[in-house]
Swiss-Prot record:
GO biological process: glucosylceramide biosynthetic process; methylation
Family: Belongs to the CFA/CMAS family.
Disruption outcome: Leads to increased resistance to cell-wall-damaging agents, such as calcofluor white (CFW) and Congo red (CR). Accumulates unmethylated glucosylceramides.
InterPro entries given in the database record: SAM-dependent_MTases_sf, Sphingo_C9-MT
Identification of the protein by name: Sphingolipid C9-methyltransferase B
Pfam family, one: CMAS
CDD domains in UniProt: AdoMet_MTases
Annotated glycan sites: N55, N175, N294
PANTHER family: SPHINGOLIPID C9-METHYLTRANSFERASE A-RELATED, SYNTHASE, PUTATIVE (AFU_ORTHOLOGUE AFUA_7G04190)-RELATED
SUPFAM superfamilies: S-adenosyl-L-methionine-dependent methyltransferases
Role according to the record: Catalyzes methylation of the sphingoid base component of glucosylceramides (GluCers) at the C9-position. Sphingolipid C9-methylation requires 4,8-desaturated ceramides as substrates. Glucosylceramides play important roles in growth, differentiation and pathogenicity. The methyl group at the C9-position distinguishes fungal glucosylceramides from those of plants and animals and may thus play a role in host-pathogen interactions enabling the host to recognize the fungal attack and initiate specific defense responses.
Length: 510
């Protein structure tokens, strides 16, 4: 083994912890919050499920009228013509957008007033380090969430308790106004990333993220090393993270009707756990693709340790655009499409179409955003784009994914929405991360720890409340010759797919 490979942490180099138990809340009032509160064991139940301001009060007509009306007025005032209008329009479009979104996000009312906020002062939840910040945000004067996030990463403010617990009460101490720093990131970084998504750009942005260290990911993903949503099988039971991930892999294999000896391509395979599961439990011949060298080393090492020969299954370090141009019985891609980019999504699906046998099936799992957005959704999403998933921009409402798949030549066979399952998964990731706090800070520093701590805690909430969700889609080629009747037996929802895998004794990774 080369010296370079020796420096990569493999499964035997990691001491995995058992997911710590959830902490009791310090902030519960015991009073009626105005709506029913759930008591499921599978997720952290929200104490204040507040519907914040968003598209319910946002007027596209008013925005459009302002964008056109201001340059029209200036053109009339100065006695100009069409060229003058174009000049003033180009001059004013960005300031108008910034001013409009700032005003709307600051002064729009909540979508509804059902939830009663405790009304505690800001300092009950968070503690500022600088006197000027204490003077600026105190009592009922709430801090913009984006400003708070940046200050928290810089160590200028602390939570007065467990991060997730305090974030559950964020509507009592923060607002969701768009800030100048947020606009600078959108214009100067986010839009630039969205425009291109070249291979070189993706390697520059994606590879350092997933090659940041296998130990970094192991500290929250646990022994399965799966960076996608698990599945809850029983809301009244707190399944382990490993059980939830096994549930998901079993469902994937059943939904595509995977059979022994079939070839399967897993695009964006991560650390290769699905490839190992499908190889061991279903006898498939799997090729996994990842752009990350550390993931490739881990995945192949785990396959060999499980007794799976390279002739059967392997992980390749390769950009999806360089995928082997051969035909596969089944294709899977779990939450890698976000890195493809909105502009390239249909072309990517068409590439998959060309690599899939005519009677094959493809499983697509993608994160999504709701059409009925709230301002918090954008602020959370841009935090993720800046610090966690740089360049990942293809999280959209469901209709856009369906359109891209159909334009690529596919027919949608089935769809499940699993956002709340993601919340349960993230809850366990968050507890793992907090449980490894000392090791993380010792190697990566306190800022790195805080970036991911806030991401995981906030995402637990975002996926539970609908800010973000996740879709499982199974598609087949939309050809007259596609034997659709053969797919009826595998046309499962979540419960049916998992039951079929359990009945066959294939639902747990050995």
């Amino acid at each position: 083994m080369s010296e370079e490979k020796k420096s990569v942490e493999l499964s035997g180099d990691i001491d995995f912890i058992e997911t710590p138990p959830a902490k009791a809340s310090q902030f519960e009032t015991g009073e009626d919050c105005g709506i029913e509160v759930t008591k499921a064991a599978a997720i952290p139940n929200p104490p204040l499920a507040v519907d914040g301001p968003g598209n319910e009060s946002f007027s596209n007509y008013l925005l459009g009228g302002t964008l056109v009306g201001l340059p029209a007025f200036l053109t009339w005032f100065f006695g100009g013509g069409a060229k003058t209008f174009v000049f003033f329009f180009l001059l004013s479009v960005l300031p108008v957008l910034v001013a409009f979104w700032t005003y709307a996000s600051t002064f729009s009312p909540r979508t509804n007033e059902k939830v009663k906020l405790p009304g505690r002062p800001v300092e009950h939840y968070i503690t500022f380090k600088r006197e000027e910040d204490k003077a600026k945000w105190h009592g009922k004067n709430k801090i913009p969430m984006q400003t708070f996030a940046e200050m928290y990463l810089d160590g200028l403010v602390d939570f007065n308790g467990d991060t997730l617990d305090v974030m559950e009460y964020r509507h009592d101490w923060a607002n969701f106004s768009f800030t100048w720093d947020l606009f600078k990131f959108i214009v100067g970084t986010f839009f630039v990333d969205v425009l291109f998504h070249t291979k070189a750009q993706d390697e520059e942005q994606v590879r350092p993220n997933y090659d940041s260290g296998n130990d970094h990911y192991a500290w929250f993903l646990g022994p399965r090393m799966i960076y996608t949503s698990g599945i809850i099988s029983d809301p009244e039971k707190e399944e382990t993270l490993e059980e939830m991930q096994d549930n998901k892999m079993a469902i994937v294999c059943e939904k595509i009707g995977l059979k022994e000896g079939e070839t399967m391509l897993d695009i964006g395979c991560g650390w290769g756990t699905l490839a190992r599961f499908a190889s061991l439990n279903y006898g498939a011949k799997v090729t996994g693709l990842t752009i990350a060298e550390n993931q490739t080393a881990w995945g192949n090492d785990a396959l060999r340790k499980a007794g799976i020969p390279e002739e059967q299954s392997k992980i390749l370090c390769m950009d999806y655009r360089d995928a082997p141009r051969t035909k596969f019985d089944k294709i899977t891609q779990l939450e890698m499409g976000e890195h493809v980019g909105i502009r390239r999504l249909t072309g990517f699906f068409r590439q998959c179409y060309d690599m899939l046998k005519d009677d094959g099936a493809m499983y697509v799992q993608l994160s999504g955003l709701r059409q009925a957005w709230q301002y918090e959704d954008f602020i959370w999403g841009l935090y993720l784009n800046k610090y966690i998933f740089r360049g990942a921009d293809a999280s959209t409402p469901l209709w856009y994914y369906v359109k891209c798949l159909e334009q690529a030549g596919f027919e949608v066979k089935g769809i499940d929405t699993v956002g709340v399952h993601y919340s349960g998964t993230l809850w366990r990731w968050y507890r793992n991360w907090v449980g490894n706090v000392e090791a993380i800070k010792a190697k990566y520093g306190p800022r790195w720890y805080r970036i991911w701590e806030l991401f995981l805690a906030w995402s637990v909430i975002a996926s539970r409340q609908g800010s973000a969700t996740c879709y499982q889609m199974v598609v087949v080629k939309n050809l007259n010759s596609t034997h659709r009747i053969n797919g009826v037996a595998s046309q499962f929802g979540l419960a049916g797919a998992l039951a079929a895998s359990r009945a066959a004794g294939k639902s747990r990774l050995p």
